[in-house]
Amino acid sequence: MQKSIIITGAGRGIGAATAKTFLEAGYRVGLVGRNEDTLKAAAGDHPNSMVLVCDVGDPASVDQAFGTAMHAWGRLDVLFNNAGRGSPPKTADETDIDTWMDVVRVNLTGSFLCARAAFAIMRSQSPQGGRIINNGSVSAHAPRPGSAPYTSTKHAITGLTKSLSLDGRRYDIACGQIDIGNALTEMVEPMKTGMPQADGSIRPEATMDVAHVANSVFHMAEMPLDANVQFMTVMAPKMPFIGRG
């Protein structure tokens, strides 16, 4: 039976690379994001792709997107909760409340709303079950300077992952988290020229091909439901994570 996955933040970067990997593997792929043009570019003309324009922070928009996919497919096997955003590096006292609220809305509330929609589908479908994969970050373990909004949401994603794992047991819903470090995307490109470090210096950082992330998500998704990659860290080995700070 052909499997299906919904990928949020699928218009570019990690999401687009992951969509490409799953389409090539024969999955039906729902590409979720706010920009229809970037979603269409990522989907190409692949017959198994479905563009789902959606604001992940809006409950009605999320329900509509997941409902559209279910109407077409009748089943959802995997959710990759990937949508997220950062903010300019500032200390807590320099961070305005609108920036804080927007990062929380996308990174945390959006992940919860999409997980909630997927959980309901996976719980009610037959055969029951499915898999939710949350994009954490190495920032779920160690912060960068001036990253209070982003780091806080990524720590919270770990709590969401654990809660979904526990609540999903009786319904064969597995949940895992992939913590990614310096995959080369548009957002990470500036790291090649210089990023603030914990000692106050600005230094370039090592990066890795985003395809390694896509392949890792695929590995997690392909596990049988009696096995689960609970947490995985995929990172550029020379980036300042181990020993950061």
Language-model features, listed with the residues they occupy:
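Residue(s) in the substrate-gating loop at a strand-loop-helix junction
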Residues: 137
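Conserved glycine-rich Rossmann-like NAD(P)H-binding loop of the short-chain dehydrogenase/reductase
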Residues: 25-41
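Active-site helix of classical SDR
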Residues: 115, 153
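Conserved glycine-rich cofactor-binding loop
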Residues: 11-13
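C-terminal helical subdomain
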Residues: 177-178, 196-242
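Substrate-binding pocket helix/loop in short-chain dehydrogenase/reductase
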Residues: 90-92, 96-104
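The beta1-alpha1 cofactor-binding region of Rossmann-like NAD(H)/NADP(H)-dependent oxidoreductases
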Residues: 54-64, 97
